[in-house]
């Protein structure tokens, strides 16, 4: 059963709000933790493409770019189904009889494009064994936090985030679904040269989408014409995607995602965190950030 059918199950908000459990120190929904053995033993294939991100780091945007490249800029083909059906999250687990990510992935014909928010040490080992290609997208911590906070407010399948001040503390401590942002971006960065991983930055994609789309196409070994490239840039722009029901999650009932609280595609602008953090919160966050990122050579931009 698809997500759109969830309203027919007459589930209340209390039924959707997940209980959480830790798996290897990472906070997950109880449904995911109960199915962890199946997730861990997922069988990847050599021609799989995996899009890996921390939550709210540009997952859907990257997915649309990849889909457009794979389909030579054919917009109709890229609107064949909703984003979560075209490229499922392998770990996302829903109450029966709804289709979970594993169900969708296992039914897909090859070649598959799949997604995950899992930290690197929790990626099913078959992806390494099969040498699948992986695109990782990282976004600066402050913008990621604000976006994740508003997403958690509107998405009834995520834990209640509380106030922004409370959420900042949860985020810093890694006590949010999928764990610590710091460990996530560093973990994937540390293995990027050992595997077929293209590591991208959200801010670079916003600054020069043409350059970054070319990088993705090269990684996918796809030749695209200038005409197709420009088409991809246009159709994957924030304003166009925001109006695309196959990408913006508006086909879901408000009992699952309430767009009146916050749209799924909210602003997408680097530096928007400045409209939400107080000076004291920003200074405290920066001090904690320096401690947690000490020794890493990753450079993030908090505005462009």
UniProtKB/Swiss-Prot annotation:
Q: Does the keyword Chloroplast apply?
A: no
What are the subcellular locations of this protein?
Cytoplasm
InterPro entries reported in the protein's UniProt record:
P-loop_NTPase (IPR027417), Sulfotransferase_dom (IPR000863)
In terms of superkingdom, the source organism counts as: Eukaryota
Q: In which tissues or organs does this protein occur?
A: Liver. Male >> Female.
Q: What is its EC number?
A: 2.8.2.-
Induction info reads:
Induced by estrogens and suppressed by androgens.
Instruction: Print the keywords alphabetically.
Output: Cytoplasm, Transferase
Q: Where is the active site?
A: 117 (proton acceptor)
**What residues does substrate bind to?**
115-117
**What molecular function does GO assign, one term?**
alcohol sulfotransferase activity
One GO CC term on file: cytoplasm
Q: Which example biological process does GO assign this protein? A: sulfation
Q: Where does 3'-phosphoadenylyl sulfate bind?
A: 56-61, 139, 147, 202, 236-241, 264-268
The UniProt similarity line reads: Belongs to the sulfotransferase 1 family.
Its annotated function is as follows:
Sulfotransferase that utilizes 3'-phospho-5'-adenylyl sulfate (PAPS) as sulfonate donor to catalyze the sulfate conjugation of drugs, xenobiotic compounds, hormones, and neurotransmitters. May be involved in the activation of carcinogenic hydroxylamines.
What is this protein's record name? Sulfotransferase 1C1
Q: Which organism is it from?
A: Rattus norvegicus (Rat)
């Amino acid at each position: 059963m698809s997500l759109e059918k969830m309203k027919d199950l007459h589930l209340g908000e209390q039924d959707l709000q997940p209980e959480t459990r830790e798996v290897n120190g990472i906070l997950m929904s109880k449904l995911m933790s109960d199915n962890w053995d199946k997730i861990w033993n997922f069988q990847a294939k050599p021609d799989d493409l995996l899009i890996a991100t921390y939550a709210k780091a540009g997952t859907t945007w990257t997915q649309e770019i990849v889909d457009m490249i794979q389909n030579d800029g054919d917009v109709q083909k890229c609107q064949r189904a909703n984003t979560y059906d075209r490229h499922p999250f392998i770990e996302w687990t829903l109450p029966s009889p709804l289709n979970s990510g594993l169900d969708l992935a296992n039914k897909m014909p090859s070649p598959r494009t799949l997604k995950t928010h899992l930290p690197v040490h929790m990626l099913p080992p078959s992806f390494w064994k099969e040498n699948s290609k992986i695109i990782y997208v990282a976004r600066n911590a402050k913008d990621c936090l604000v976006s994740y906070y508003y997403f958690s407010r509107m998405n009834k399948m995520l834990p209640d985030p509380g106030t922004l001040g409370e959420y900042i503390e949860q985020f810093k401590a890694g006590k949010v679904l999928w764990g610590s942002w710091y460990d996530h971006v560093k973990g994937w960065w540390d293995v990027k040269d050992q595997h077929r991983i293209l590591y991208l930055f959200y801010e670079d994609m916003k600054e020069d989408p043409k350059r970054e789309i070319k990088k993705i196409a090269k990684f996918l070994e796809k030749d695209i014409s200038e005409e197709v490239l420009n088409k991809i840039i246009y159709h994957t722009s924030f304003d166009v995607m925001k109006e695309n029901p196959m990408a913006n999650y508006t086909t879901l009932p408000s009992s699952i995602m309430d767009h009146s609280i916050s749209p799924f595609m909210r602003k997408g602008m680097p530096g928007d965190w400045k409209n939400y953090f107080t000076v004291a919160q920003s200074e405290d966050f920066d001090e904690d950030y320096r401690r947690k990122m000490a020794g890493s050579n990753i450079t993030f931009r908090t505005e462009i």
